[in-house]
């Protein structure tokens, strides 16, 4: 293979890996949020309010799982072009070991507390909206189309999280819970902007986007929401270790249980 062919193959491999990691993000985030439906985590709506967050969270979860289906399905077709073997969405969900998933660690922890759910959704949805907005300009028509569909839904995801951050921030006890949750998950935020070889190669070809360029807008969005909730971020966005993060297949202790639960839900029959 000549130099030009090798570069093209590297770009195609990176593009496939880029789509797969985004599919994994949406899959795990959607599953985690779906688990909260009927769990009692979301308080009943107050009399006279227009929002019932249980069904709204379920709507967001379904949207993320649809996005995951589109991305994983596309990743499988891209793999077929590279290897001659196509894996379906279900193959990619059920046929990979935990260390072959490339999702962000941010979306993995169990939702045992509403404050943790709200913080995670705020941080992730603000990132996802910036990411998919940028991807609408992808040189790949399929990815750009998936991104355009996502951008129609993601503002609702972000606004739902912001609204709940404001609601929890209004009470002293709930604001303390929100602050504790923020302290706990903040170390995972560096991975959102990790510019590894996959991201850089996908961005250089015009297929993807370098996550590092999303950081200023994300910080402005998150800082504004936290300020309105009478909170502040714990510190600067940390630098993620490229070899010890979800993008490298290194996951939290919760992930094996998450994956087992996700597969049970998708079991035939």
Regions found by a protein language model. Give the residues of each.
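Acidic/His metal-coordination segments adjacent to aromatic residues that form catalytic metal sites
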Residues: 2-24, 93-120, 171, 185-207
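Hydrophobic packing residues in well-ordered alpha-helices of helical domains and bundles
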Residues: 19-22, 26, 57, 118, ...
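Helix-loop segments that flank and shape redox-cofactor active sites
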Residues: 29-59, 127-143
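A structural signal for well-ordered alpha-helices, especially hydrophobic packing surfaces
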Residues: 30, 37, 68, 72-75, ...
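Conserved alpha-helical segments that form or flank metal/cofactor-binding pockets of metalloenzymes
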Residues: 60-95, 161-164
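Internal, conserved structured core segments that host functional sites
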Residues: 104-159
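A contiguous pocket-lining binding segment that forms or flanks enzyme active sites
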Residues: 142-204
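Extended, helix-rich structural scaffolds rather than catalytic motifs
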Residues: 176-269
């Amino acid at each position: 293979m000549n130099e030009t062919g090798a570069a093209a193959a590297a770009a195609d491999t990176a593009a496939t890996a880029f789509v797969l990691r985004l599919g994994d993000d949406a899959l795990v985030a959607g599953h985690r949020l779906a688990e909260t439906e009927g769990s009692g985590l979301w308080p009943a709506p107050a009399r006279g309010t227009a929002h019932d967050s249980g069904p709204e969270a379920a709507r967001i979860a379904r949207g993320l799982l649809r996005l995951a289906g589109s991305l994983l399905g596309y990743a499988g077709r891209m793999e077929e072009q590279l290897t001659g073997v196509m894996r379906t969405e279900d193959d990619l969900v059920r046929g990979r070991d935990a260390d072959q998933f490339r999702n962000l660690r941010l979306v993995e922890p169990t939702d045992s507390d509403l404050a943790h759910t709200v913080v995670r959704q705020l941080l992730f949805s603000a990132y996802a909206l910036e990411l998919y907005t940028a991807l609408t300009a992808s040189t790949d028509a399929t990815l750009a189309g998936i991104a355009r569909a996502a951008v129609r839904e993601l503002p609702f995801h972000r606004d739902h999280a912001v609204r709940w951050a404001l609601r929890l921030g209004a009470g002293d006890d709930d604001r303390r819970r929100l602050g504790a949750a923020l302290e706990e998950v903040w170390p995972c935020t560096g991975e959102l902007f990790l510019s590894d070889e996959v991201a850089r190669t996908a961005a250089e070809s015009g297929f993807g986007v370098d996550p590092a360029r999303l950081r200023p807008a994300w910080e402005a969005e998150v800082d504004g929401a936290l300020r309105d909730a009478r909170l502040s971020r714990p510190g600067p966005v940390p630098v993620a270790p490229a070899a010890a993060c979800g993008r490298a297949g290194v996951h939290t202790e919760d992930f094996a249980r998450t994956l087992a639960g996700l597969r049970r839900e998708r079991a035939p029959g």
